[in-house]
């Protein structure tokens, strides 16, 4: 027997639609940044580091609201790819701070341009007011559901 409480319409599910939209954005962004030698896995960390260099892994984890192990793997790949260097903190040699290489700094403009192009294309069907409302709603949901880090948040100053 069919139970209406168990029905699920993926086309009316915020979670399903957000996930689907995120995959579409990621696919389009990936196509634009791979030629730069970047990936969608490293792009969020670069966005933070382009704003504030010299962060610790822990600060990046908090800023991006991701798992420590995921961040460790991402930083290892970024170091391998010549995007970052890790240097001991001057005050506490046990702490490693993350710095961008000249190569990574030089990729900021083309990578951000690629992301803006993807955003503009994706949000093209919406009016300016709808875009603003959409971004505002997503930001509010993230703030209400997340850990407090998210869009617009910056790691604590050192």
Regions found by a protein language model. Name each.
Residues 1-36, 100, 155-158:
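N-terminal leader segment of winged-helix/HTH proteins
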Residues 67-70:
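Helix-turn-helix DNA-binding motif, specifically the short coil turn and the N-cap/start of the second
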Residues 26, 76-143:
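Charged, amphipathic alpha-helical coiled-coil/dimerization segments
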Residues 1-10, 128-158:
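C-terminal regulatory/oligomerization modules of transcriptional regulators
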Residues 48, 63, 81:
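Residues within the alpha-helical elements of helix-turn-helix
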Residues 52-56:
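Short capping segments at the starts of secondary-structure elements
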């Amino acid at each position: 027997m069919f139970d209406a409480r168990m029905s699920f319409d993926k086309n009316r599910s915020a979670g399903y639609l957000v996930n689907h939209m995120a995959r579409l954005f990621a696919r389009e962004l990936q196509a634009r940044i791979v030629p730069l030698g970047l990936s969608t896995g490293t792009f969020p960390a670069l966005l933070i580091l382009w704003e504030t260099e010299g962060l610790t892994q822990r600060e990046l984890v908090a800023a991006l609201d991701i798992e420590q192990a995921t961040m460790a793997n991402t930083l290892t790949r970024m170091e391998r790819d010549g995007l970052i260097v890790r240097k001991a903190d001057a005050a506490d040699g046990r702490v490693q701070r993350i710095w961008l290489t000249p190569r990574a700094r030089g990729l900021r403009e083309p990578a951000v341009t690629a992301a803006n192009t993807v955003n503009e294309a994706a949000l093209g069907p919406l009016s300016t007011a709808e875009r603003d409302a959409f971004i505002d709603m997503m930001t509010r949901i993230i703030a209400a559901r997340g850990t407090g880090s998210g869009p617009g948040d910056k790691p604590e100053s050192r």
